[in-house]
A protein has these predicted regions:
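N-terminal Rossmann-like NAD(P)+-binding subdomain of aldehyde/semialdehyde dehydrogenases
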Residues: 1-62
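Rossmann-like NAD(P) dinucleotide-binding subdomain of oxidoreductase/dehydrogenase enzymes
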Residues: 18, 22, 46-143
Length: 143
């Protein structure tokens, strides 16, 4: 749903990629496409592994079970030079695996960080599962 939303209406993100991150329109469009690819990739991957344990034969005859579970709380700090694609990749990977996420975008692209988080909340990700912290690098250091 988020990928489709961004794909059908990328204009606000493109505008701020150009004006806040300094990208050309072509670079902004490329970053939007990459962000959409991340969303679709992680949604497809989680469907493959969700609730599926794999039985693995061990080298000495034992049987091992590989299972996936959430790890807890993730911190995603995004760079200024790919503020949408990398951030969406980080968030979608962590959320797809059932983790809570705190996001701290670069202070140079904080509007884009806010807009990305807003997209996830709009499509049903609870605020308690995806939080946003804005500030300079000292906030990232403290986190």
């Amino acid at each position: 749903a988020i990928a489709n939303d961004i794909e059908t209406s990328p204009y606000e993100l493109i505008y701020f990629l150009m004006h806040e991150a300094g990208k050309t329109i072509y670079n902004a469009m490329d970053e939007i496409r990459e962000a959409i690819d991340f969303l679709r990739y992680y949604s497809e991957e989680i469907i493959k592994i969700h609730n599926r344990d794999s039985i693995l034969d061990g080298p000495t005859g034992e049987i091992n079970t590989l299972s996936y579970s959430e790890k807890g709380h993730f911190l995603c700090i995004s760079p200024w030079n790919f503020p949408v694609a990398i951030l969406i990749g980080q968030i979608s990977a962590a959320l797809a695996c059932g983790n809570r996420v705190t996001v701290k975008p670069s202070e140079h692209t904080s509007i884009l960080g806010y807009l990305v988080i807003k997209k996830f909340h709009k499509h049903g990700v609870p605020v308690s599962a995806l939080e946003l912290i804005l500030g300079d690098g000292t906030y990232g250091d403290a986190l």
